[in-house]
C-alpha cells in the first residue's frame, strides 16, 4: 500500500465510513468526531470537517442525532469561542430535518453554543440564523426557531430585539399548529429574557392569542406558560392577567387542557399566591376533582396533598375532603390508585383529630379496595399516618385490615406488608407481634412466590436484630428449623437461606448448637441444589464460629461434598475448602 500522508488519513477514513452502507460504521465515525478533529487540528476541522458535515444532513436519523449531539460540545475543537460560529451551519441544517428528536437535539446544541458566543458573533451569525429558521418555508425550521429565541435575544441591540419580538409574535399566529405549539411551549423561556416593560404590552398579548387558539394541543401548552409567566409578572398583573386564564382553562371544553391544569395546579397556585388560591382556585380545583373525565380526576387526585398544604386545615376539610371521600369510591381504579398514593400525606396537614374523624375511614376503605395497586399505595405510606395518630390507634383501626392483606392474592401486596412488618413490630412491641404476626412470618417462608420467600427470610433477620437473639431463639428459630424436613426442596432451601441471614445476628453459640447440625444434615439431601447451597452456607459460617468447629465439623462436611457426583456441588465445596485454607494461612 502506498504511504498515506498521516494527517490526511483520519479524514479519509471518516469520509469513507460516513458513506458506508453499514449504518453502524457511519455511527461509529460520527461518535469519533472529536478524535478526528484533534488529529486534523483546529484549522482543518473548521475548513474541511465542518463543511463536510454541513453537506451530509440527509443521513439516517440515528446518525444525524449523534451528529447534533457531538456538535454541541465541539467549540474546543474549532479553536474556541472565537470560532464558535463555524458550528452553526451544520446545526442549522439539522434544525430543518423531519425527525423531531434530531431537531430537538440540534436546538439544544445551538443553545449551548449560542450561550457561549461573544455578543458581536451573536449579532452577526446567531441572530441571522434565527431569522432564517423563523422565516423558513418548511414548518420544521419554524418549530426549531422557537427554541432558540431566548439565546439570541440576550446579546442583541434594541432594534434587533424589537425585530425578534415581532418575529416571535408571528410564530404565535403561524398557520401550522405545530409551530404555534412550539411557540407556546417556549414562550416562558423567551419571556425570561425580555425586558419587563415589554412583558405586559407584547409577551402577554402573544400569550392571550395562544390561550384562545382553536387547537387544544396549543392551549394545553399555554397552561404551562401560566406558571412561568406568573413568576415574571408583578402580583397585581398576575392576578389580572393569569388568574382568569387559569379559571377558564379549568373549564375548557377539551379534557386534555383541563388535565394539564390539574397536573400543573400546584405551580399555578404558587404563581398567583395564597389569597387567590383560596378564593378562586379552590372552586376550580373542586371542579377538576369532580370532572366527568377520569384522566382529569386522576391528575387532580394526585395533587390533593400538595394542594391542601396551601390551605388551612379548615378550608381543606370544608372543600377538599368531601371530594376526597367521593374519589375513594370512584368508578375508575386508576383514580382511586392516584388518591391512595398521596392521601396519607394529608394526615400531618389535617392533624390528629381530623385524621381520626375524616381520614381513617377513607384509609380503611382503600385498604380493602379490590384493585391491588390501591391497597399497595396505602400500605407503603402507613408510617405517615402513624406519626400523626400514634401506633395504638393505628393498630386498633387499621391493623386487622393489614393482617388480612398479609394473605392477599397479589404477591406485590404481600411483599409490601412483609417489608412493613419490622417497622410495625418495633412500634407495636413483642407481645403484639407474637399474637398477630408471628405465624404469618413463617407462612411467608413457604410462599409460592420466590420474592416473598426471600423477603420473609430477610424479615426474620431484621426481627432478630430488633428483638434480640434470646427472643428469636424462642419464637423464630424452632419454627424455621422445623421446616427442614419439608417435602418441597424449595422450602428446605429457604431454611438454609434463613440460617445464612440469621447466623451473624444470633452469634457463634446458637449457630454451633442449633444451626450447624441442621446444615450438616442437609448436606446429605438428595437434591444437588440443596447440597451446593449447604457448601455456600458453610463458607459463610466460617467467620462466625470458632476455628475448632471449622476444623472438626465444617471441613469434614465440605470434604464429603467435594466428592459428590454433581459437578456444581463439588465446585462450591472446593471453593469453601479453599476459603478455609486461605483463612488458616492468614492466621498462621
Swiss-Prot record:
Principal location class: cytoplasm
Name of one Pfam family that matches: PPP2R1A-like_HEAT
Record GO terms (molecular function): salicylic acid binding
SUPFAM superfamilies per record: ARM repeat
Modified how: Ubiquitinated. CHIP-mediated ubiquitination enhances phosphatase activity after an abiotic stress such as low temperature or darkness.
InterPro entries in alphabetical order: ARM-like, ARM-type_fold, HEAT, HEAT_type_2, PP2A/SF3B1-like_HEAT, PP2A_Regulatory_Subunit_A
GO cellular component, one term: protein phosphatase type 2A complex
Key word Methyltransferase present: no
Subcellular location: Cytoplasm, Cytosol; Nucleus
Keywords recorded for this protein, A-Z: Abscisic acid signaling pathway, Auxin signaling pathway, Cytoplasm, Ethylene signaling pathway, Nucleus, Plant defense, Repeat, Ubl conjugation
Tissue expression summary: Mostly expressed in cell-dividing tissues such as apical meristems. Ubiquitous, with higher levels in roots and flowers (at protein level).
HEAT repeat spans: 2-42, 44-80, 81-119, 158-196, 197-235, 236-274, 275-313, 315-352, 353-391, 393-430, 432-469, 470-508, 509-547, 549-586
Domain of life: Eukaryota
GO biological process, one term: positive regulation of abscisic acid-activated signaling pathway
Role noted for this protein: The A subunit of protein phosphatase 2A serves as a scaffolding molecule to coordinate the assembly of the catalytic subunit and a variable regulatory B subunit. Seems to act as a positive regulator of PP2A catalytic activity. Confers resistance to phosphatase inhibitors such as okadaic acid and cantharidin. Involved during developmental process such as seedling and floral developments, root gravitropism, and stomatal opening regulation.
Subunit details: PP2A consists of a common heterodimeric core enzyme, composed of a 36 kDa catalytic subunit (subunit C) and a 65 kDa constant regulatory subunit (subunit A), that associates with a variety of regulatory subunits such as subunits B (the R2/B/PR55/B55, R3/B''/PR72/PR130/PR59 and R5/B'/B56 families) and the regulatory subunits TON2. Interacts with CYP20-1/ROC7. Also interacts with phosphatidic acid (PA), a lipid signaling molecule. Interacts with CHIP. Interacts with SIC/RON3.
PANTHER family: SERINE/THREONINE-PROTEIN PHOSPHATASE PP2A 65 KDA REGULATORY SUBUNIT (PTHR10648), SERINE_THREONINE-PROTEIN PHOSPHATASE 2A 65 KDA REGULATORY SUBUNIT A ALPHA ISOFORM (PTHR10648:SF29)
Domain description: Each HEAT repeat appears to consist of two alpha helices joined by a hydrophilic region, the intrarepeat loop. The repeat units may be arranged laterally to form a rod-like structure.
Protein family per UniProt: Belongs to the phosphatase 2A regulatory subunit A family.
Protein name: Serine/threonine-protein phosphatase 2A 65 kDa regulatory subunit A alpha isoform
Annotated source species: Arabidopsis thaliana
Amino acid at each position: 500500500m502506498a504511504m498515506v500522508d498521516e494527517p490526511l488519513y483520519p479524514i479519509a477514513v471518516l469520509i469513507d465510513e460516513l458513506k458506508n452502507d453499514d449504518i453502524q460504521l457511519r455511527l461509529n465515525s460520527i461518535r469519533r468526531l472529536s478524535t478526528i478533529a484533534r488529529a486534523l487540528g483546529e484549522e482543518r476541522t473548521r475548513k474541511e470537517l465542518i463543511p463536510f458535515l454541513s453537506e451530509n444532513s440527509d443521513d439516517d436519523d440515528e446518525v444525524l442525532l449523534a451528529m447534533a449531539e457531538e456538535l454541541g460540545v465541539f467549540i474546543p475543537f474549532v479553536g474556541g469561542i472565537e470560532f464558535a460560529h463555524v458550528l452553526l451551519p451544520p446545526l442549522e441544517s439539522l434544525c430543518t430535518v423531519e425527525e423531531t428528536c434530531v431537531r430537538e437535539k440540534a436546538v439544544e446544541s445551538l443553545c449551548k453554543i449560542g450561550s457561549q458566543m461573544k455578543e458581536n458573533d451573536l449579532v452577526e451569525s446567531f441572530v441571522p440564523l434565527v431569522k432564517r429558521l423563523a422565516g423558513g418555508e418548511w414548518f420544521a425550521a419554524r418549530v426549531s426557531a422557537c427554541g432558540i429565541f431566548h439565546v439570541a435575544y440576550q446579546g442583541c441591540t434594541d432594534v434587533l430585539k424589537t425585530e425578534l419580538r415581532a418575529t416571535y409574535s408571528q410564530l404565535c399566529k403561524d398557520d401550522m399548529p405545530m409551530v404555534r405549539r412550539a411557540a407556546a411551549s417556549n414562550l416562558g423561556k423567551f419571556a425570561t429574557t425580555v425586558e419587563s416593560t415589554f412583558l405586559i404590552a407584547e409577551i402577554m398579548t402573544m400569550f392571550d392569542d395562544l390561550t384562545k387558539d382553536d387547537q387544544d394541543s396549543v392551549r394545553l401548552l399555554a397552561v404551562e406558560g401560566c406558571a412561568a409567566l406568573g413568576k415574571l409578572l408583578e402580583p397585581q398583573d398576575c392576578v389580572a392577567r393569569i388568574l382568569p386564564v387559569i379559571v377558564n382553562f379549568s373549564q375548557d371544553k377539551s379534557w386534555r387542557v383541563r388535565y394539564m391544569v390539574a397536573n400543573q395546579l400546584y405551580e399555578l397556585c404558587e404563581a398567583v399566591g395564597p389569597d387567590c388560591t383560596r378564593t378562586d382556585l379552590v372552586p376550580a380545583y373542586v371542579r377538576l376533582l369532580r370532572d366527568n373525565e377520569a384522566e382529569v380526576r386522576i391528575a387532580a387526585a394526585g395533587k390533593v396533598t400538595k394542594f391542601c398544604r396551601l390551605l388551612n386545615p379548615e378550608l381543606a376539610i370544608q372543600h377538599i375532603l368531601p371530594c376526597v371521600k367521593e374519589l375513594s369510591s370512584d368508578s375508575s381504579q386508576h383514580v382511586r390508585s392516584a388518591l391512595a398514593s398521596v392521601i396519607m400525606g394529608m394526615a400531618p396537614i389535617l392533624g390528629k383529630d381530623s385524621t381520626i374523624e375524616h381520614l381513617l375511614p377513607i384509609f380503611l376503605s382503600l385498604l380493602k379496595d379490590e384493585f391491588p395497586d390501591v391497597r399497595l399505595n396505602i400500605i407503603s405510606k402507613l408510617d405517615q399516618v402513624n406519626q400523626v395518630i400514634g401506633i395504638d390507634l393505628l393498630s386498633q383501626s387499621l391493623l386487622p385490615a393489614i393482617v388480612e392483606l398479609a394473605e392477599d392474592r397479589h404477591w406485590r401486596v404481600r411483599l409490601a406488608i412483609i417489608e412493613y412488618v419490622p417497622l410495625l413490630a418495633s412500634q407495636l412491641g413483642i407481645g403484639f407481634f407474637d399474637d398477630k404476626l408471628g405465624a404469618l412470618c413463617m407462612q411467608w417462608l413457604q410462599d409460592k412466590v420466590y420474592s416473598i420467600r426471600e423477603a420473609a427470610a430477610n424479615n426474620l433477620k431484621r426481627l432478630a436484630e430488633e428483638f434480640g437473639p434470646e427472643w428469636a431463639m424462642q419464637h423464630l428459630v424452632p419454627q424455621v428449623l422445623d421446616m427442614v424436613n419439608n417435602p418441597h426442596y424449595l422450602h428446605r432451601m429457604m431454611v438454609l437461606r434463613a440460617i445464612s441471614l440469621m447466623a451473624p445476628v444470633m452469634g457463634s453459640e446458637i449457630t454451633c448448637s442449633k444451626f450447624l447440625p441442621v446444615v450438616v444434615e442437609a448436606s446429605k439431601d438428595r437434591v444437588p441444589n440443596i447440597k451446593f447451597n449447604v457448601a455456600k452456607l458453610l463458607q459463610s459460617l466460617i467467620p462466625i464460629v470458632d476455628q475448632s468447629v471449622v476444623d472438626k465439623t465444617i471441613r469434614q462436611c465440605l470434604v464429603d461434598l467435594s466428592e459428590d457426583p454433581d459437578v456444581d456441588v463439588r465446585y462450591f465445596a472446593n471453593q469453601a475448602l479453599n476459603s478455609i485454607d486461605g483463612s488458616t494461612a492468614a492466621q498462621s
